[in-house]
Amino acid sequence: MGLSPNATTAGPRLPRPLVAPAATGILDPRTGRPVGADDRFFLEVNNELADKGFFVAATDDLITWARTGSLMWMTFGLACCAVEMMQMSMPRYDAERFGFAPRASPRQSDVMIVAGTLTNKMAPALRKVYDQMPEPRYVISMGSCANGGGYYHYSYAVVRGCDRIVPIDIYVPGCPPTAEALLYGVMLLQKKIRRTGTIER
């Protein structure tokens, strides 16, 4: 049995160096890097993992990381914005891939999405549902009517913005806002939670 001309008889093969795989996902046309690659949180985690192979984190950082990846939202669909809110959870946009899943009970929810016109009669019910949510709780105001009364701003029966009833974390403008706009609002809320933490709140 002879050796082929390409075979080498030198000692044992040396291990190949580890090479990171090529970037995948949606690329930013300006930088050529994946979208979100400049997020401070992920850069710190990636650098620490590359350095040691493991990372040490404070409990608050761990809780904040877990909370941003498992936000449960409660629907408070009051008008036509609720149609776009429902579309956000359908297969085309699939909000659950961001860890954002709907819940039927306020006691299991972290986020309330107020979508539509808030009337004076509905305001006490909105506050009651908000009070039933466990801390820390967040509110997204969706659409012009929820943000400031919208088309019905001068009506005697309409609350001119749901921020008069509950504290708002994210405002999503539009009449009605698209599902993409609401999804972007959810991603902004996740960034806000990462930035401020959950125990401090």
UniProtKB/Swiss-Prot annotation:
Cofactor requirement: [4Fe-4S] cluster
Annotated EC: 7.1.1.-
This protein's UniProt keywords: 4Fe-4S, Cell inner membrane, Cell membrane, Iron, Iron-sulfur, Membrane, Metal-binding, NAD, Quinone, Translocase, Transport, Ubiquinone
Catalysed reactions, semicolon-separated: a quinone + NADH + 5 H(+)(in) = a quinol + NAD(+) + 4 H(+)(out)
UniProt-listed Pfam families: Oxidored_q6
InterPro entries named in the record: NADH_UbQ_OxRdtase-like_20kDa, NADH_UQ_OxRdtase_20Kd_su
Manner of cofactor binding, per the entry note: Binds 1 [4Fe-4S] cluster.
GO terms for biological process, alphabetical: aerobic respiration; electron transport coupled proton transport
Subcellular location, principal: membrane
Subcellular location: Cell inner membrane
Oligomer status and interactors: NDH-1 is composed of 14 different subunits. Subunits NuoB, C, D, E, F, and G constitute the peripheral sector of the complex.
HAMAP family found in the cross-reference section: NDH1_NuoB
Record family assignment: Belongs to the complex I 20 kDa subunit family.
PANTHER family the UniProt entry points to: NADH DEHYDROGENASE, NADH DEHYDROGENASE [UBIQUINONE] IRON-SULFUR PROTEIN 7, MITOCHONDRIAL
Protein name: NADH-quinone oxidoreductase subunit B 1
Organism this protein belongs to: Rhodopseudomonas palustris (strain BisB18)
Gene: nuoB1
